[in-house]
């Protein structure tokens, strides 16, 4: 599957981890697990919980430079119920999948 190289802004990640590769790997592992858990909870969550999950994911994504995930999470956070929310969940799921794939590549290369 093709994914944008910008799924994670590596310069931002390195800045946030002070260039410490071990810390970078740890932060990426934490985000990877958190993102998988939060995405898994979205389908059965009520509106209030969806907003809280999207907000949590938005903050975590910004911290590692996964700006497409953060943007998609913010879109979900602001979405209305129904079709708009379904589309926002789809965009977020795709962005998370791309970020997690890049994380896998980064961790495998480390």
Spell out what each predicted region is.
Residues 37-52:
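Helix-loop segments that flank and shape redox-cofactor active sites
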Residues 1-11, 22-41, 60-75, 82-110:
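Amphipathic, coiled-coil-like alpha-helical segments
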Residues 12-18:
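Short hinge/gating elements
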Residues 52-54, 97:
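N-terminal cationic amphipathic segment used for targeting or macromolecule association
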Residues 17, 42-46, 80:
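Hydrophobic residues in alpha-helical segments
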């Amino acid at each position: 599957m093709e994914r944008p190289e910008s799924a994670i802004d590596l310069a931002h990640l390195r800045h946030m981890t002070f260039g410490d590769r071990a810390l970078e790997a740890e932060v990426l592992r934490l985000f990877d697990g958190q993102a998988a858990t939060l995405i898994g909870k979205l389908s059965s969550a009520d509106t209030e919980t969806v907003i809280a999950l999207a907000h949590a994911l938005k903050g975590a994504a910004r911290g590692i430079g996964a700006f497409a995930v953060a943007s998609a999470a913010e879109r979900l956070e602001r979405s209305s119920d129904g079709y708009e929310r379904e589309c926002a969940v789809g965009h977020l799921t795709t962005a998370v999948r791309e970020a997690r794939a890049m994380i896998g590549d980064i961790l495998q290369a480390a």
